[in-house]
Swiss-Prot record:
Its cofactor is Mg(2+). It comes from the Bacteria. This is tRNA dimethylallyltransferase. It catalyses: adenosine(37) in tRNA + dimethylallyl diphosphate = N(6)-dimethylallyladenosine(37) in tRNA + diphosphate. The keyword tRNA processing applies. The record marks T100 as: Interaction with substrate tRNA. InterPro entries: Dimethylallyltransferase (IPR039657), IPT (IPR018022), P-loop_NTPase (IPR027417). Transmembrane segments: none annotated. Substrate binds at T11, G12, A13, G14, K15, T16. One of its GO terms (biological process) is tRNA modification. Residues 34-37, 158-162 are annotated as: Interaction with substrate tRNA.
Length: 305
């Protein structure tokens, strides 16, 4: 089995610093496991590692997708698995780093082999959701796939749309696909959670927003708008991106933009903490305790050389 180290946790907790340290100690290669950091036009707003940080060791799957391209767990697996295999073959320790828990779960536990959904079908359901609202589509899903509807919040528009598009495109409910057996994982994983409390994170997140603005986040958003001026494009859905879009369009003041940005980031961190607290065999460690992280990685992954 291929040893991998997964470094997860809420946004702003210090995952990047931990990954760079472990990569230096264990001759590691960093692989992005964050659905927002794939977008090439938002390196500052999505807090991607700097070019200097990326030059310190191999980095993969950062800043390569266009604003109108859609990332998913399936796309992530198709890209990440060959990279993990190649880096392991070169004697480097793969480090999966990010806050998208679904991608980590797909990698370690497998994912349903759902066929690609035609863009026309996806767009149709997105437009219906925008026109009718998520609760109305949730009621429709209750009739078509009650098992999936039961576990989704009526306002969870993204997952409701996903379930309906799968139902239409494949003729089978999403719950059927999720019930199908998946092959065993080829990875031996150690999972590190960079610990943080929501109250402890909040001032750090507020400071990070100010640092992003000072680093050119507003110009970054303006440039991105010149590339794609469609707020429903996948790249614009990220926190920070959507709020800056509203500010540039004159819908909110800069102060309100920053308030919404912080509020939405905090809510996202809360959801991440809830998700990762349910993750089995996850070792929560202080982000500054690099020695403890080293011991944990040594005990499970050992040396790749």
């Amino acid at each position: 089995m291929i040893p991998v180290v997964c470094i997860v946790g809420p946004t702003g907790a210090g995952k990047t610093a931990a990954s760079l340290h472990l990569a230096a100690v264990f001759d590691g290669a960093v692989i992005n496991c964050d659905s927002r950091q794939v977008y090439k036009d938002f390196p500052v707003i999505t807090a991607q590692p700097t070019l200097e940080e990326q030059a310190s060791c191999p980095h993969h799957l950062y800043g390569f997708m266009g604003i109108q391209e859609k990332m998913s767990a399936g796309v992530f697996l198709d890209m990440a698995c060959p990279i993990i295999k190649e880096e392991h073959a070169h004697g480097r320790l793969p480090l999966l780093v990010g806050g998208t828990g679904l991608y980590l779960r797909a990698l370690l536990d497998g994912i349903a082999a759902i066929p690609d959904i035609p863009e026309t079908v996806s767009q149709k359901w997105q437009e219906r959701c925008a026109a009718r609202g998520a609760p109305a589509l949730h009621r429709l899903l209750e009739a078509q796939d009650p098992q999936t509807a039961e576990r989704l919040h009526p306002n969870d528009s993204q997952r409701i749309v996903r379930a309906l598009e799968v139902q239409e495109a494949t003729g089978r409910p999403l719950s059927w696909w999720h019930a199908q057996p998946v092959p065993p994982s080829p990875y031996r994983a150690v999972k590190i959670g960079v610990s943080a409390t929501l109250d402890g994170l909040t001032p750090r997140l507020a400071k990070r927003i100010e640092m992003m603005l000072a680093a050119g986040a507003l110009d970054e958003a303006r440039n991105a708008m010149g590339i794609c001026d469609n707020p429903r494009a996948p790249g614009w859905s990220g926190i920070g991106c959507a709020e800056l879009y509203s500010y540039i369009k004159g819908a909110v003041s800069l102060d309100e933009c920053k308030r919404l940005w912080l509020h939405n980031t905090r809510q996202y961190a809360k959801r991440q903490l809830t998700w990762f607290r349910r993750e089995p065999n996850l070792h929560w460690l202080d982000g500054t305790d690099m020695a403890a992280m080293e011991r944990l990685v040594h005990s499970v992954a050992g040396s790749t050389g």
